[in-house]
Amino acid sequence: MSWQQFKHAWLIKFWAPIPAVIAAGILSTYYFGITGTFWAVTGEFTRWGGQLLQLFGVHAEEWGYFKIIHLEGSPLTRIDGMMILGMFGGCFAAALWANNVKLRMPRSRIRIMQAIIGGIIAGFGARLAMGCNLAAFFTGIPQFSLHAWFFAIATAIGSWFGARFTLLPIFRIPVKMQKVSAASPLTQKPDQARRRFRLGMLVFFGMLGWALLTAMNQPKLGLAMLFGVGFGLLIERAQICFTSAFRDMWITGRTHMAKAIIIGMAVSAIGIFSYVQLGVEPKIMWAGPNAVIGGLLFGFGIVLAGGCETGWMYRAVEGQVHYWWVGLGNVIGSTILAYYWDDFAPALATDWDKINLLKTFGPMGGLLVTYLLLFAALMLIIGWEKRFFRRAAPQTAKEIA
């Protein structure tokens, strides 16, 4: 394979979702084994909100929530912080390689309000459940934490309501039609594409250099950034978005991304299991109403906003301004949750047990239960897809006739 063939196939073209999500599952497994924590983003975004408040004299470090997730240090001294910086760098490099960076403004104030309000709801729900589509779902289920299953089911339900809500007439933005005499071919400016590809390489190797230099003195921080770059490349090149996985399933019947996510978790689970058997402690959270309520809010919020915690990150660096507002909403929502946490934490979370399936059913029993539940989820998704298109077929035939 020549350089030009490799460049076009792997650095410019989008990647297939299933292999990319499987790769993300494997990468997240090694990330857990090496750093001792799971791939997660909203916890760090919440810390950013807390530290912004500290700049204005607010003693956020005294809030109960920040005593749980820890507010010490800065993004440059925290594993999650360095990983997220790596993610942004990886996303930006991948977008530049493909010449997929362009400033795109929201076309309506309604879209901006959707982004902010949906982002706030999603951020609040994610932190109520102690995780978003990563820590309470994609990387939470392979940790064998029961709360992640509560969150996943509730998120699916919340996304159904979100999909129905966003189909209301108020969200239908008028499309401006422009008369043309012929179709315009899709073209790129070769010089611009070359410049951006080189800039992408500069960003990529710059991030690698930063990570390796950091790893010389602080190995975990440097490796966290390297993992972040890998995660960023995967989510941008494969356009991995959990919002589309849920929303598309309800609206269009497409389940390709949802299936990919299930398979990715199945691959990750056995790796996490092996690390746990070697003595690494899994991340188990409270299996209480917080997981259910948080999941409902999160599912509704991500569909209203149009993007989840990973989806908005790569779209933001591609220049889609709508997702800058989603990200801002996430930080605001998660910070609001941190402020009110002490008021309802006992009733919704901390008075409930942290249930580890590997302890409840034994190591092999917990592993088996997890795979049975993943298989059941996959069968339900396939069943929904068949039902959706079976119901849609007569309507399509009627429209054609």
UniProtKB/Swiss-Prot annotation:
It holds the Pfam family Sulf_transp. Its main location: membrane. This is Probable transporter YedE. The keyword rRNA-binding does not apply. It comes from the Bacteria. Keywords: Cell inner membrane, Cell membrane, Membrane, Transmembrane, Transmembrane helix, Transport. The keyword Transmembrane helix applies. The chain crosses the membrane at residues 14-34, 79-99, 116-138, 148-170, 199-219, 222-242, 260-280, 284-304, 321-341, 364-384. Belongs to the TsuA/YedE (TC 9.B.102) family. GO terms for cellular component: plasma membrane. Residues 35-78, 139-147, 220-221, 281-283, 342-363 are periplasmic. It is found in: Cell inner membrane. It is a multi-pass membrane protein.
